[in-house]
């Protein structure tokens, strides 16, 4: 274990331990090189550092994740070894794993479950494109950021399609609750194995639990390739059949029945909540024969309740005691056949006479009493026709919100279906006005007109949809930039909550930035992107020995100025250029050494352009070796590349002694 507060690998200050896996520990750390950015550091535990298989598996994860750059995959920032310890650093996701999220937020709405699964599929599409099978997909290996973004992690047992397994039992690595049937049989994991695991994860999101469980790994594994998948709709009636069909196909036991790619599953998932799939039949597979698929017809509630219970009881009794065809209780001696026929005929005739007499007596005294038909789920027109056919009158129509019954269809009658009423009784209809609530989607980046139409379709009144415009140079006019209610919010139509959409409009003004010190090419490009006409961007060059050539030294107008692009004015940028001429300093009275050094190092004159001559005459007070003349003179302009500088040094004549 790494000590808290220690600086690991020369850059990571360990804050705390946040995880402990089968082979590695995970720490929250601050990256000192990246200004204290929080990262997760995963370190292979000491007892595995000398295990070549463990090290290979750890390095496999590092390589696999480093090769996958995707917004829905945890990003690797560093891989290395410190004091013999294998480690990798990755982005820190400050949220929950999907397992815990399901536990704390179940039930998840259909929309949220589809959104999360869609993000997981996009991540795995990249992995599969790169030839990588995860092989350990489970909710614990999917992290959710505070804004609900899903990120896949822990590619610790991922394997490339073409690579050889690490060990003979390698194909059985992974969590058995999400293990595909082919893996449970010991076959090699494939892309379709990951798809199966995602199907089980999706099942868990919509039901709150895993489909197969048991006392041992063997028991659970057997269920994966022997037991049919329990019905999602049986546990969560809000799930439409099209959505359950996605899970059924993803978890098909035969590979030929399962999705062949995550792209195929993603396309099917994307339309699973659409209106045109609302009446989809349940998808089933024959997992034992060559037949690929069958379709079960939809069964209505009335069909279910009409199945004779006596038959079920009889069958149950015959199965329970099949050897006893006739019991002592059921046995009766039988009369001769001729007498039996005569007796039955007389009894039947008497019964018919009695029934006829009773009917005549009842009908002559009371109006007919009829059971009200069940019209739930029918349109208003269909329900009225059904009731009129049964000799009922139509009463009042009332509307009521319903999460299950489609708008415009009957929820129930008043009095209720099956109730006995006289002919001509007025039957009231309770009609669905649609869902009382819905999940707010992510509208950012979409056209505001499309979003408004969608909200109106969901019965949000016009006066509750507020549009606020905001100038934008980055987004197309009419695009939604912000929304007041975040994605995933449950919107209750009865509470009349306002929805504010901030929509981009073409910018007419911009704020000029501080361009001093920046490269002129970048600034010109930025101004052009903000619709400043190129002919109004004026560049003035000025020699500078202090600034890099091309660097902006002055600007007009200044930083912070509001600039109207609809009425553009000139912007002047003063840009540094390399110094080519300077004013000649005065070196009269200086030494030769000082003068040359200053000309070369400070002024920038090349040594080859400096000429030194000696003169024997000089002003009074001159000292030998002193500069007494210079050309050019002090203050004159000197071209650093062309001008030759002449320096005259005083050297007095030597006089010889008289003999």
UniProtKB/Swiss-Prot annotation:
Assembly behavior: Homodimer. StkP forms dimers through its transmembrane and extracellular domains. Dimer formation likely promotes autophosphorylation activity and might be necessary for targeting StkP substrate. Interacts with MreC in the elongasome. May interact with sensor histidine kinase WalK, thereby playing a role in signal transduction by WalK.
CDD domains tied to this protein: PASTA_pknB, STKc_PknB_like
Enzyme's top EC category: transferase
One BP term from GO: regulation of cell shape
InterPro entries in alphabetical order: Kinase-like_dom_sf (IPR011009), PASTA_dom (IPR005543), Prot_kinase_dom (IPR000719), Protein_kinase_ATP_BS (IPR017441), Ser/Thr_kinase_AS (IPR008271)
Name of the protein described by the UniProt record: Serine/threonine-protein kinase StkP
Reactions it catalyzes: L-seryl-[protein] + ATP = O-phospho-L-seryl-[protein] + ADP + H(+); L-threonyl-[protein] + ATP = O-phospho-L-threonyl-[protein] + ADP + H(+)
Organism from which the protein derives: Streptococcus pneumoniae (strain ATCC BAA-255 / R6)
Domain Protein kinase: 12-273
Disulfide-bond pairs as recorded: none
